Design a protein with these regions (language model features):
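Alpha-helical metal-binding/catalytic segments enriched in His/Glu/Asp
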Residues: 6-54, 110-116, 121-144, 171-172, ...
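Acidic/histidine-rich catalytic neighborhood of metal-dependent amide-processing enzymes
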Residues: 12-101, 153, 242-245, 249
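Active-site-adjacent substrate-binding region
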Residues: 130-155, 311-354
């Protein structure tokens, strides 16, 4: 990796051309420094190195925890330098599957693109009120059924680790009047979306239409009845904060986010995740989305699930960290309630008496090639 200091964002350290997790990298660096610097004074330490954290916490899941004797843990996959993470969400990842009927229609092909969205981390940014391209697409598809002589051929939203920021569709448009209706719908929705999400900084949401074929040919298009069901599914699946909790009801306790969508060859598929600080709320939400799917004729498959890192009100380690931070910096440390899945949930599920907290340097741009650490 080519490391460099970037002064454009303050004094930061970054790596060129990679989205590898900088938080994982700094955790490795800190542990290796402790292991190879004999002049540092500390009690006996155990170091747990894991693999494939970003792709599914697989290293932590496969580890044999009978090897661990320690019962106090510092995790380094967390927030800013003045912040302590005390818990994190568990999750259920689902795939919805629905078949649909097609009807042949003659017309020219148009492409439609929903873009200009901010996107972001599906955990850390989910409470910021940003738009999700799949949710917007659901509204477009539902209203498309009201356009005469314009039909959906297929649709795609590429897989995203975060909040989807772009969706594409192919449409069959019979004539000029249908094109006019379609463009009016696109203009109306674009204005509506920009207004609805302006407070979240979504000033550039766009719905663009472009003719990609001039010759009118016959295409297999989704039936209006099934298109309504697909639109209802995309809009009915909960997105964003489902329930707040904690002090002053200010902590996102349960959230939902769709991450991938595909309509092709008589099959509609949708990927959706529930994240929750409460196991009971996680499974209650899972039950409700399965009921919605059943009403619309869709099947649901659980692809993966993992437990959260529960919040402890009696953590000696967290109390010690608060005390030391106050003594060192003259201010209270901030508390983070993590919204992205992380390894302590897996570890504490295996070792319930483990007392854990999360500390890390300040970083920005997670899951992007702009990820960087502040070093001054």
């Amino acid at each position: 990796l080519y490391l460099y200091r970037d002064a454009d964002y303050g004094i930061t350290l970054a790596a060129r051309g990679t989205s590898l997790g900088a938080d994982n990298g700094v955790g490795l660096a800190m542990m290796l420094t402790l292991m190879t610097t004999p002049e540092l004074l500390h009690p006996p330490l155990e170091f747990l190195f894991t693999v494939e954290e970003e792709s599914g916490l697989w290293g932590a899941r496969k580890f044999d925890y009978t090897q661990i004797r320690a019962r106090h843990m510092i995790n380094m996959d967390s927030g800013d330098a003045d912040m302590m993470c005390v818990c994190s969400t568990g999750a259920v990842h689902n795939r919805f599957h629905m078949t649909y009927k097609t009807v042949p229609h003659r017309g020219t092909v148009y492409s439609g693109t929903i873009g200009g969205l901010l996107g972001g981390h599906s955990g850390n940014d989910i409470a910021k009120g940003r738009a999700n391209a799949i949710s917007l697409l659901g509204e477009f598809l539902e209203k498309l059924t009201g356009c005469e002589n314009a039909w959906l051929i297929d649709a795609d939203v590429q897989e995203s680790q975060g909040i989807p920021d772009q969706a594409t569709v192919r449409l069959c448009v019979e004539n000029g009047e249908a094109e006019k209706q379609l463009r009016q719908l696109a203009d109306m929705l674009q204005k509506s979306w920009r207004s609805a999400y302006r407070a979240a900084g979504e000033d550039n949401i766009a719905l663009r239409l472009e003719q990609v074929e001039e010759e009118a040919l016959v295409h297999d298009c989704i039936s209006c009845e099934d298109l309504r069901k697909i639109g209802a599914l995309l809009q009915g699946i909960p997105y964003g904060v489902i329930e707040y909790g904690g002090k002053n009801q200010s902590i996102p306790f349960c959230t939902g986010c769709t991450s991938r969508f595909c309509v092709k060859e008589n099959v509609c598929q949708l990927w959706f995740s529930v994240r929750s600080l409460s196991e009971a709320l996680k499974w209650d939400t899972e039950k409700s989305v399965k009921e919605l799917a059943s009403q619309l004729g869709a099947d649901v498959e659980i692809l993966d699930q993992y437990p959260g890192w529960p919040y402890r009100t009696d953590s000696p380690m967290q109390e010690l960290c608060k005390k030391l931070f106050q003594e060192m910096y003259g201010e209270e440390i901030k508390i983070e309630y993590g919204q992205g899945g992380c390894e302590p949930g897996i570890i504490i599920d295996k070792l319930p008496d483990m007392d854990a907290l999360g500390l890390a340097p300040t970083s920005r741009g997670a899951h992007t090639t702009r990820e960087r650490f502040y070093i001054e």
